[in-house]
C-alpha cells in the first residue's frame, strides 16, 4: 500500500496540486462536447420532454430521469450503459446532465469579447492596432488591407466602402486584398510569428528613447512572451465553435401555474442558434453580400451578449426591460459564483434563534432549546434509537422522533453530552465571532448565552439572533473542542489582553462590593478568619464596607505560607477568596476599589501565572459574585443624582467676557476671523471642561445628610468610574453643560449649548444639537459598509500569509523605541516589545550581563530586566525582515497573542492580522452616535511645561533676542529635551518656529514650569536683523489686496494668488530688509534678507517702516480646527493601506543639503537642494500657494519636510527605506486607533505592510529575460537572479515598490483568489492568456476548489501528504 493512501482515500479535489487556466482551442471544445446543438427549441410544450438536438436534448446531455431513456424502452439499473436505438439516449444517471457539454459549430468565426473589450484589449495589442479599429473591422464597418499587392496601400490600413471602391477603380480588382469581419482578424492573428516578433520588439525597445513608446512596447512584448510560454495560439481568441454548458446549470423549471421559469442563458443561446442557422441558410442560398454581412454582425453580437452582456453596445434585454444575465455576470460580484457559492455556502445542520442571557451557565456551556436540538441532532438520534433496539428501522425512528416520545428525550440527552456546538453571531468580524460550547438542553425557544462571551461576540440581549452549527465528524468535534471552545479563547488575538472580562452590572457589583466607607459600623475591628467575620456581618457588627484588619496567610516566593495583617473590608476579602493561590498574585491587586481595568489586570495575571483552567474558574466565580452584589446593592439613579455645579454660571460669565474681548479685538482688526474663531472655540472648550471638572468633584464627594440608610455614593458616578456604563463625556452632558457642537461637515459651531439635559435645552440649542446627532446617525449607516469593505480587502491581501517554518535564520530586524508625543510617553517600550523576539544579543548597559539571546522571546520576566536596565531602544525581529520564501517564520512573528506562547506552524496570521485591524474599525464607526455630536476637541497646545524636575538641553538652537528682550526660536527643527541626573532623556518637545523660549540650554527646571510659548493659530514670519521694510512684487489687486472685514470694516493686506492675470504670473511677493544706505541686508548664512510670502499670509508691517530683530512681518493663519473622530480615522487607515497620495501631500527632501529658491516656473515655485557631498543638486517644483516650511539657506536633513502635510508613502520608501516607512505606517494607523482607546499589536499592521511590499520593479534587466519597468514578485525575482548567476549572467536589479492592498490582492500569484476578489473578467482573461498556474497556496483558492485550507490542522495534513508523495516516489 502506498504511503499516500494511508491518509484515507484522497477525494477528487486532493488528487491535484495545481490548477492551470488556458484559452480553449476549437479542438478542445469539440472534445468536451457530446454532440452539436442545432435547434433553438428547449422542451416540447405538450409532453414536457426535451426536443431532439435542442438546448436540453437528452441524446446529447443525458437522460432526464435516472437509468431511464427518453422513450421509456429501457428502465432500471440492469440496462445501464446501453444506448437506446429508438431515441438515442444513453441509460445512466441523470446527474450527467450537470457535466456533459454540447457545442455549436459557428457558420462564421466570432471574436471572444473578453479578449477584445477587457482592457487592455489583447487582440488589438497583438495586432498593434487601436481597439476602435479592430471593432470597426469585426462589426463590419471598415475593410482592412491584408495584402497591399501592387498598390501603395499599407498593410493593416482601414478602408470604408467608398474608399475600397475608389482603390479598386484605381488599382484594379485583383491588385490588392482587403477583407472584413472576424475571418480577417483570425487570419492576421494566425500570420503572427511570435519568435520573430519578440526579437523585433526587443531590438526596438533598445533603440527607442521615448518613455510612452517604451511602455507600449513593453506591454506588447509581455503579451507576446505570455503567448509563447503558455503555448496558446492567438487565433483561438477568435472562435469557430461555441461550447454549450450543461443543461442542469441553466435549468428550465415549471412553475405552479403551468408557466416556465428559465435561466437567461437559454434565451441567449437561443438567439445565437437562431442567428447561426439563419446565417448558414443565407450562405447556402448565396444571398447578397450585404445581407450575409449583417447576419454575421448579428451573430457576433449574440455571442457577445452570451459571454458578457452589456460590455459592448446596448445590453440585450428581456420582455421586462431587464438585461439578461450573461456568463460573466454569473461569476461577478457578491451574487456571482465565486462569492455566493464557492466561498460562502449555506450549510445543513444549522439553526438560528434569539439569544437570552444565561447567568447560571458555566463558561464552556450554552443553553440549546430542546426543539432545536431535536431537529439538529436527528441523524444521531435515529442511529442511537436503532442501536438500542428502541426502534427497529430508521423509518420507525423517524416516526418516534416526530411524535416526540419520552424515550427520544433520553436519547437526545445522551447524544448531546460532550458534543460541542458552534455558535456564531453575524457580523463575524474576527475569529471570536464563532465559538464552540457544550450544549445544555433547556425549555423555551431562545438560546442561552454566557454573559462573559458577549464582548467577543459583541452581542447584547436586545433581540440579537445567533446561529448554531453542529460539527459532525469526529475530527470536526475535536477541532471545535481544542481550538474553538470558549474556554480556549480567553485572550484577544488582536492585543493579547483578556477578552473574557466582566462588564456592565458585574463590574458595578464588584465595584460596590469593594468600596470602603469611612465611619461605618465596627470600624477597626480585627478578625482572623472568615467565618468569624460572617458571624459579625450577620449580627450587624460590621457591614461589607467597614474598614477592618484581617490576618491572612499568604504564599511567599519560597512557596511557604506566612501570615500577614492587612487593612481591608469584608467585601474585598470575598473577592480575595476567589483568587488562586500563587506567590505572584498578591492580595494587594484586589485590595482596592475594583474598576473594570483592575479586574481585567487581575484576570490577565491569573492567566499568565496560573494557566487557563484557573482563569476560567476565577472568571466564572467573579461573575456570580458581581451579579449577586449588583442585585443586592440596589443601585439606581434618579434626577437628583445629576448634580449641576454651583460654579457653572460664574464660569460661563467669565467665558462670555473673554469672548466679548475677542470680538472687540476682531472688530479692531487685531486678529483675523479665523483666529477669532479658533480662540472662541478654545475658550468654550476650556469652560466646558471647567464646568465638567467642578461637577465631577461634586458628584465624587457624596452629600452629607442625616438619613441613616442614605446611599453613600452617587450612583451615576459609580457607574462611570467603575467602567460599568457611560463615560464622563456623557455625564458632563447630563449635569454640566453640553458644550460645543459639530456641524455635519466636522466644523464646530461657535455658540455652545450652555444647558444640560437636566435643565433642558432651549429651542435654539435643541436645533443646534440635532445637527451633530444626525451626523452620528448617518456616519453609522455609511461607515459600517466602508469598514466592512476595508476588512474584506485586508483579508484578501493577507490571506496567504501563513507561518511555514520555525526560523528563517535572518539576522535582520527593526529598531523600536517608545512612542513619545507632546513630551508624554504614550506607548512605553515594554508594550511594543512584549511577545517579540530579539534580533541581536542584548546586554545590560552598565554591568554588561547578557539579558537576551538572539532569537529569544521577550516575555514578562525578561521585560522587567530590560526595564530595570533602562534600555530605551531595542532591535527586534519582525515579519518585515523575515526571509522565508513562502509565508513567515515563527521567530520573526513572535508570540501568538491568543495563547501567549510562540506562534505555531500553520497559523493563518494574515487573516488574524486583517481581522484585528478591521474589527475595531467596524466597532468604532458604530460608536460615534453615543455622545450625540458633542464636539470633543482639546484646546490647542500653545505652550510646553516641564513634566519632571530636570535639566534642559536644546537641540539645533537658533535664537534671536527681540525688542522685548525675549528669546525667539528661528530654527525649524528645534527640540527641547529634559534630562535626569544620569543624562537619560525623560521627555522631548518640538518647539515650533517663532516660539518664545522661556529657558535656555543647561537650565535646571522644576515640574510644571513653563518652558516655551507660542501662538497656536498662526505661523509667523520673523526677521533676524533690524532694518527698513521694502515691499517687492506686491501689486494691489493682483498679488495683494486689502481685505476689509465685513464685521469690523478694518482693512488688512493679504497675499492672493496672482496667476489669474497674465502679468501676475511672474510676481513673487516678498519683503526685503534694507540697511541705512538702502542696500539689502545680508543675513548670517550669507544670503540676502528676502522673505517670500505664501498665498493667504496677512501682513503685519507697512511699506517703508523700520523694524527690529525678532519682529513679526507677516502671519500665516492655520485652518480652523475640526473635530477628530474615527470618521477622520477610518478613511485615514484606508488611505494608508491603499498607499494613496494624500490630498495636499508633503514634499520631503531626498538628501542632506542647503536650500535655495530658484527661478519660478509658471505657477510653480522652484526649491533647489544642494547636497553637502557636492553631488548633483535636486530640484522640486511646488505650487506657489503652498506654505514652504524651510527658508532660503536652511540646512535640511534627508527626509525633512519642505512643504507641510502628510508625506507620500512611496516617497518615504524611496528616500528613507523600508524600516522608516513601516514605522511611519504603524505609527499613523496606531494613532487613529489610539484616539478611540483601541489597542492593536504592531505586528498585525506589519503583516499587512509586508503584503504591500511583495513586488519589485525591474530597473536593470542584466542578463535575464526581465523587462525594465516590469513589476514582479520579490521571490520570483530572487529565483530568476539565482538562475542567472548560476549560468554566469549578470543579475537583474530592481527596487521595492509599495502597492495598495486592492492592487496587491489583484496581483497575487493565485489567479483564483484574485478573480474571486474583484474585476473577475479582467483577472481571468489575463490568467488565461498567460496560461497561469495556481499552486493553491493560499486559503481562498483551497476553499474555492473544495479542499482543506493549508492552515491549522490542514497545514499538517498538507505537509504529511507532500512528504508521503515524496516517499512514494523514492520507493518507486
From Swiss-Prot:
<comment type="subunit">
    <text>The RNAP catalytic core consists of 2 alpha, 1 beta, 1 beta' and 1 omega subunit. When a sigma factor is associated with the core the holoenzyme is formed, which can initiate transcription.</text>
</comment>
<dbReference type="GO" id="GO:0000287">
    <property type="term" value="F:magnesium ion binding"/>
</dbReference>
<dbReference type="GO" id="GO:0008270">
    <property type="term" value="F:zinc ion binding"/>
</dbReference>
<feature type="binding site">
    <location>
        <position position="462"/>
    </location>
    <ligand>
        <name>Mg(2+)</name>
    </ligand>
</feature>
<feature type="binding site">
    <location>
        <position position="87"/>
    </location>
    <ligand>
        <name>Zn(2+) 1</name>
    </ligand>
</feature>
<dbReference type="InterPro" id="IPR007066">
    <property type="entry name" value="RNA_pol_Rpb1_3"/>
</dbReference>
<feature type="binding site">
    <location>
        <position position="889"/>
    </location>
    <ligand>
        <name>Zn(2+) 2</name>
    </ligand>
</feature>
<dbReference type="InterPro" id="IPR007081">
    <property type="entry name" value="RNA_pol_Rpb1_5"/>
</dbReference>
<dbReference type="Pfam" id="PF04998">
    <property type="entry name" value="RNA_pol_Rpb1_5"/>
</dbReference>
<dbReference type="InterPro" id="IPR006592">
    <property type="entry name" value="RNA_pol_N"/>
</dbReference>
<keyword id="KW-0460">Magnesium</keyword>
<keyword id="KW-0862">Zinc</keyword>
<feature type="binding site">
    <location>
        <position position="460"/>
    </location>
    <ligand>
        <name>Mg(2+)</name>
    </ligand>
</feature>
<feature type="binding site">
    <location>
        <position position="71"/>
    </location>
    <ligand>
        <name>Zn(2+) 1</name>
    </ligand>
</feature>
<feature type="binding site">
    <location>
        <position position="882"/>
    </location>
    <ligand>
        <name>Zn(2+) 2</name>
    </ligand>
</feature>
<keyword id="KW-0808">Transferase</keyword>
<dbReference type="Pfam" id="PF04997">
    <property type="entry name" value="RNA_pol_Rpb1_1"/>
</dbReference>
<dbReference type="InterPro" id="IPR000722">
    <property type="entry name" value="RNA_pol_asu"/>
</dbReference>
<dbReference type="InterPro" id="IPR042102">
    <property type="entry name" value="RNA_pol_Rpb1_3_sf"/>
</dbReference>
<dbReference type="GO" id="GO:0003899">
    <property type="term" value="F:DNA-directed RNA polymerase activity"/>
</dbReference>
<dbReference type="GO" id="GO:0000428">
    <property type="term" value="C:DNA-directed RNA polymerase complex"/>
</dbReference>
<dbReference type="InterPro" id="IPR044893">
    <property type="entry name" value="RNA_pol_Rpb1_clamp_domain"/>
</dbReference>
<dbReference type="GO" id="GO:0006351">
    <property type="term" value="P:DNA-templated transcription"/>
</dbReference>
<dbReference type="Pfam" id="PF04983">
    <property type="entry name" value="RNA_pol_Rpb1_3"/>
</dbReference>
<dbReference type="InterPro" id="IPR012754">
    <property type="entry name" value="DNA-dir_RpoC_beta_prime_bact"/>
</dbReference>
<comment type="similarity">
    <text>Belongs to the RNA polymerase beta' chain family.</text>
</comment>
<protein>
    <recommendedName>
        <fullName>DNA-directed RNA polymerase subunit beta'</fullName>
        <ecNumber>2.7.7.6</ecNumber>
    </recommendedName>
</protein>
<dbReference type="Pfam" id="PF05000">
    <property type="entry name" value="RNA_pol_Rpb1_4"/>
</dbReference>
<keyword id="KW-0548">Nucleotidyltransferase</keyword>
<feature type="binding site">
    <location>
        <position position="464"/>
    </location>
    <ligand>
        <name>Mg(2+)</name>
    </ligand>
</feature>
<dbReference type="InterPro" id="IPR038120">
    <property type="entry name" value="Rpb1_funnel_sf"/>
</dbReference>
<comment type="function">
    <text>DNA-dependent RNA polymerase catalyzes the transcription of DNA into RNA using the four ribonucleoside triphosphates as substrates.</text>
</comment>
<feature type="binding site">
    <location>
        <position position="808"/>
    </location>
    <ligand>
        <name>Zn(2+) 2</name>
    </ligand>
</feature>
<feature type="binding site">
    <location>
        <position position="69"/>
    </location>
    <ligand>
        <name>Zn(2+) 1</name>
    </ligand>
</feature>
<dbReference type="InterPro" id="IPR045867">
    <property type="entry name" value="DNA-dir_RpoC_beta_prime"/>
</dbReference>
<dbReference type="InterPro" id="IPR007083">
    <property type="entry name" value="RNA_pol_Rpb1_4"/>
</dbReference>
<keyword id="KW-0240">DNA-directed RNA polymerase</keyword>
<feature type="binding site">
    <location>
        <position position="892"/>
    </location>
    <ligand>
        <name>Zn(2+) 2</name>
    </ligand>
</feature>
<dbReference type="GO" id="GO:0003677">
    <property type="term" value="F:DNA binding"/>
</dbReference>
<keyword id="KW-0479">Metal-binding</keyword>
<feature type="binding site">
    <location>
        <position position="84"/>
    </location>
    <ligand>
        <name>Zn(2+) 1</name>
    </ligand>
</feature>
<dbReference type="Pfam" id="PF00623">
    <property type="entry name" value="RNA_pol_Rpb1_2"/>
</dbReference>
Amino acid at each position: 500500500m502506498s504511503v499516500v493512501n494511508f491518509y484515507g482515500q484522497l477525494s477528487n479535489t486532493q488528487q491535484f496540486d495545481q490548477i492551470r487556466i488556458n484559452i480553449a482551442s476549437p479542438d478542445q471544445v469539440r472534445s468536451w462536447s457530446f454532440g452539436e446543438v442545432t435547434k433553438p427549441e428547449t422542451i416540447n410544450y405538450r409532453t414536457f420532454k426535451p426536443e431532439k438536438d435542442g438546448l436540453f436534448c437528452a441524446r446529447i446531455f443525458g437522460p432526464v430521469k435516472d437509468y431511464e431513456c427518453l422513450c421509456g424502452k429501457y428502465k432500471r439499473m440492469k440496462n445501464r450503459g446501453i444506448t437506446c436505438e429508438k431515441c438515442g439516449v444513453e441509460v445512466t444517471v441523470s446527474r450527467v446532465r450537470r457535466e456533459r457539454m454540447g457545442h455549436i459549430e459557428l457558420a462564421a468565426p466570432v471574436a471572444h469579447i473578453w479578449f477584445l473589450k477587457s482592457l487592455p484589449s489583447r487582440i488589438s495589442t497583438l495586432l498593434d492596432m487601436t481597439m476602435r479599429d479592430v471593432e470597426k473591422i469585426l462589426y463590419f464597418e471598415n475593410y482592412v488591407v491584408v495584402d497591399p499587392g501592387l498598390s501603395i496601400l499599407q498593410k493593416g490600413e482601414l478602408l470604408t466602402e467608398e474608399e475600397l471602391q475608389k482603390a479598386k477603380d484605381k488599382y484594379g480588382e485583383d491588385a490588392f486584398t482587403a477583407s472584413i469581419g472576424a475571418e480577417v482578424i483570425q487570419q492576421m492573428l494566425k500570420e503572427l510569428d511570435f519568435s520573430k516578433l519578440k526579437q523585433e520588439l526587443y531590438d526596438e525597445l533598445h533603440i527607442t528613447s521615448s518613455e510612452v513608446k517604451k511602455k507600449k512596447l513593453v506591454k506588447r512584448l509581455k503579451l507576446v512572451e505570455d503567448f509563447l510560454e503558455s503555448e496558446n495560439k492567438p487565433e483561438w481568441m477568435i472562435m469557430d465553435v461555441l461550447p454549450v454548458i450543461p443543461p442542469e446549470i441553466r435549468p428550465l423549471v415549471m412553475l405552479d401555474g403551468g408557466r416556465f421559469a428559465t435561466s437567461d442563458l437559454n434565451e441567449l443561446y437561443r438567439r445565437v442558434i437562431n442567428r447561426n442557422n439563419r446565417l448558414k441558410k443565407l450562405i447556402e442560398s448565396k444571398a447578397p453580400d450585404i445581407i450575409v454581412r449583417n447576419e454575421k454582425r448579428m451573430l457576433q453580437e449574440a455571442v457577445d451578449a452570451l459571454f458578457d452582456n452589456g460590455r459592448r453596445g446596448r445590453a440585450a434585454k428581456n420582455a421586462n426591460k431587464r438585461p439578461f444575465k450573461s456568463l460573466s455576470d454569473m461569476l461577478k460580484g457578491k451574487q456571482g459564483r465565486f462569492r455566493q457559492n464557492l466561498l460562502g455556502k449555506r450549510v445543513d445542520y444549522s439553526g438560528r434563534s434569539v439569544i437570552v442571557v444565561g447567568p447560571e451557565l458555566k463558561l464552556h456551556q450554552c443553553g440549546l432549546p430542546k426543539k432545536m436540538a431535536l431537529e439538529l441532532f436527528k441523524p444521531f438520534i435515529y442511529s442511537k434509537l436503532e442501536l438500542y433496539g428502541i426502534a427497529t428501522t430508521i423509518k420507525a425512528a423517524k416516526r418516534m422522533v416526530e411524535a416526540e416520545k419520552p424515550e427520544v428525550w433520553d436519547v437526545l440527552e445522551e447524544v448531546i453530552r460532550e458534543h460541542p456546538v458552534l455558535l456564531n453571531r453575524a457580523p463575524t468580524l474576527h475569529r471570536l465571532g464563532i465559538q464552540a460550547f457544550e450544549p445544555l438542553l433547556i425549555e423555551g425557544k431562545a438560546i442561552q448565552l454566557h454573559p462573559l462571551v458577549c464582548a467577543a461576540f459583541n452581542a447584547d440581549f436586545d433581540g440579537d439572533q445567533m446561529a448554531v452549527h453542529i460539527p459532525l465528524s469526529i475530527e470536526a468535534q475535536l477541532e471545535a473542542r481544542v481550538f474553538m471552545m470558549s474556554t480556549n479563547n480567553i485572550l484577544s488575538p488582536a492585543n493579547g489582553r483578556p477578552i473574557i472580562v466582566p462588564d456592565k452590572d458585574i463590574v458595578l457589583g464588584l465595584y460596590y462590593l469593594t468600596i470602603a466607607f469611612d465611619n461605618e459600623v465596627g470600624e477597626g475591628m480585627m478578625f482572623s478568619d472568615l467565618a468569624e467575620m460572617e458571624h459579625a456581618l450577620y449580627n450587624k457588627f460590621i457591614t461589607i464596607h467597614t474598614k477592618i484588619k484581617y490576618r491572612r496567610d499568604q504564599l511567599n516566593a519560597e512557596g511557604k505560607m506566612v501570615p500577614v495583617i492587612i487593612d481591608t473590608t469584608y467585601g474585598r476579602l470575598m473577592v480575595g477568596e476567589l483568587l488562586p493561590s500563587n506567590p505572584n498574585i498578591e492580595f494587594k491587586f484586589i485590595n482596592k476599589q475594583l474598576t473594570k481595568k483592575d479586574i481585567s489586570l487581575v484576570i490577565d495575571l491569573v492567566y499568565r501565572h496560573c494557566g487557563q483552567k484557573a482563569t476560567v474558574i476565577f472568571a466564572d466565580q467573579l461573575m456570580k459574585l458581581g451579579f449577586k452584589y449588583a442585585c443586592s446593592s440596589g443601585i439606581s439613579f434618579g434626577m437628583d443624582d445629576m448634580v449641576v455645579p454651583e460654579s457653572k454660571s460664574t464660569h460661563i460669565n467669565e467665558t462670555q467676557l473673554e469672548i466679548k474681548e475677542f470680538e472687540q479685538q476682531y472688530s479692531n482688526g487685531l486678529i483675523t476671523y479665523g483666529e477669532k474663531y479658533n480662540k472662541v472655540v478654545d475658550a468654550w472648550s476650556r469652560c466646558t471642561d471647567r464646568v465638567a471638572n467642578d461637577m465631577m468633584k461634586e458628584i465624587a464627594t457624596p452629600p452629607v445628610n442625616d438619613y441613616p440608610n442614605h446611599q453613600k455614593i452617587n450612583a451615576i458616578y459609580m457607574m462611570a468610574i467603575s467602567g460599568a456604563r457611560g463615560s464622563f463625556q456623557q455625564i458632563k452632558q447630563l449635569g454640566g453643560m453640553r458644550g460645543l457642537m459639530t456641524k455635519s461637515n466636522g466644523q464646530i459651531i461657535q455658540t455652545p449649548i450652555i444647558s444640560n439635559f437636566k435643565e433642558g435645552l432651549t429651542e435654539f440649542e435643541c436645533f443646534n444639537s440635532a445637527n451633530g446627532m444626525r451626523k452620528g446617525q448617518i456616519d453609522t449607516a455609511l461607515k459600517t459598509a466602508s469598514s466592512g469593505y476595508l476588512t474584506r480587502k485586508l483579508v484578501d491581501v493577507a490571506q496567504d500569509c501563513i507561518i511555514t517554518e520555525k526560523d528563517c535564520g535572518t539576522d535582520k530586524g527593526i529598531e523600536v523605541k517608545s512612542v513619545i508625543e507632546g513630551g508624554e510617553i504614550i506607548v512605553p517600550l515594554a508594550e511594543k516589545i512584549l511577545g517579540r523576539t530579539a534580533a541581536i544579543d542584548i546586554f545590560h548597559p552598565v554591568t554588561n550581563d547578557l539579558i537576551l539571546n538572539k532569537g529569544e522571546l521577550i516575555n514578562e520576566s525578561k521585560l522587567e530586566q530590560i526595564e530595570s536596565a533602562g534600555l530605551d531602544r531595542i532591535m527586534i525581529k519582525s515579519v518585515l525582515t523575515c526571509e522565508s520564501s513562502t509565508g513567515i517564520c515563527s521567530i520573526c512573528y513572535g508570540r501568538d497573542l491568543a495563547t501567549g506562547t510562540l506562534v505555531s506552524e500553520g497559523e493563518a496570521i494574515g487573516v488574524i492580522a486583517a481581522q484585528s485591524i478591521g474589527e475595531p474599525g467596524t466597532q468604532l464607526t458604530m460608536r460615534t452616535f453615543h455622545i450625540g455630536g458633542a464636539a470633543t476637541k482639546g484646546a490647542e497646545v500653545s505652550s510646553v511645561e516641564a513634566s519632571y524636575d530636570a535639566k534642559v538641553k536644546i537641540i539645533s538652537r537658533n535664537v534671536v533676542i527681540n525688542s522685548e528682550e525675549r528669546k525667539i526660536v528661528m530654527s525649524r527643527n528645534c527640540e527641547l529635551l529634559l534630562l535626569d541626573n544620569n543624562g537619560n532623556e525623560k521627555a522631548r518637545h518640538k518647539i515650533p518656529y517663532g516660539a518664545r523660549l522661556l529657558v535656555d540650554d543647561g537650565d535646571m527646571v522644576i515640574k510644571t514650569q513653563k518652558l516655551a510659548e507660542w501662538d497656536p493659530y498662526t505661523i509667523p514670519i520673523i526677521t533676524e536683523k533690524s532694518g527698513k521694510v521694502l515691499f517687492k512684487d506686491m501689486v494691489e489687486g493682483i498679488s495683494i489686496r486689502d481685505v476689509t472685514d465685513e464685521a469690523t470694516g478694518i482693512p488688512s493686506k493679504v497675499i492672493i494668488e496672482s496667476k489669474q492675470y497674465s502679468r501676475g504670473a511672474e510676481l513673487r511677493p516678498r519683503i526685503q530688509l534694507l540697511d541705512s544706505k538702502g542696500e539689502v541686508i545680508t543675513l548670517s548664512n550669507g544670503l540676502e534678507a528676502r522673505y517670500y510670502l505664501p498665498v493667504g499670509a496677512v501682513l503685519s508691517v507697512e511699506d517703508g517702516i523700520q523694524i527690529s530683530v525678532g519682529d513679526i512681518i507677516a502671519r500665516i493663519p492655520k485652518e480652523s480646527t475640526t473635530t477628530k473622530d474615527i470618521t477622520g480615522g477610518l478613511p485615514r487607515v484606508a488611505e494608508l493601506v491603499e498607499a494613496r497620495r494624500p490630498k495636499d501631500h508633503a514634499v520631503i527632501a531626498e538628501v542632506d543639503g542647503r536650500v535655495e529658491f530658484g527661478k519660478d516656473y509658471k505657477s510653480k515655485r522652484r526649491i533647489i537642494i544642494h547636497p553637502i557631498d557636492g553631488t548633483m543638486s535636486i530640484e522640486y517644483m511646488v505650487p506657489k500657494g503652498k506654505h514652504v516650511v524651510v527658508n532660503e539657506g536652511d540646512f535640511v536633513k534627508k527626509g525633512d519636510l519642505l512643504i507641510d502635510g502628510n508625506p507620500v508613502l512611496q516617497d518615504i520608501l524611496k528616500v528613507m527605506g523600508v524600516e522608516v516607512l513601516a514605522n511611519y505606517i504603524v505609527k499613523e494607523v496606531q494613532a487613529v486607533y489610539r484616539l478611540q482607546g483601541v489597542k492593536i499589536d504592531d505586528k498585525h499592521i506589519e503583516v499587512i505592510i509586508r503584503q504591500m511590499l511583495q513586488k519589485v520593479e525591474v530597473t536593470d534587466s542584466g542578463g535575464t529575460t526581465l523587462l525594465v519597468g516590469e513589476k514582479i514578485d520579490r521571490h520570483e525575482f530572487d529565483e530568476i537572479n539565482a538562475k542567472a548567476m548560476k549560468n554566469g549572467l549578470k543579475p537583474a536589479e530592481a527596487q521595492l515598490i509599495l502597492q495598495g492592498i486592492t492592487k496587491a490582492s489583484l496581483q497575487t500569484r493565485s489567479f483564483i483568489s484574485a478573480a474571486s476578489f474583484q474585476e473577475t473578467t479582467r483577472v481571468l482573461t489575463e490568467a488565461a492568456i498567460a496560461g497561469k498556474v495556481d499552486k493553491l497556496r493560499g486559503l481562498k483558492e483551497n476553499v474555492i476548489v473544495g479542499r482543506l485550507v493549508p492552515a491549522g490542522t490542514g497545514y499538517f495534513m498538507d505537509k504529511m501528504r507532500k512528504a508521503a508523495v515524496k516517499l512514494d516516489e523514492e520507493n518507486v
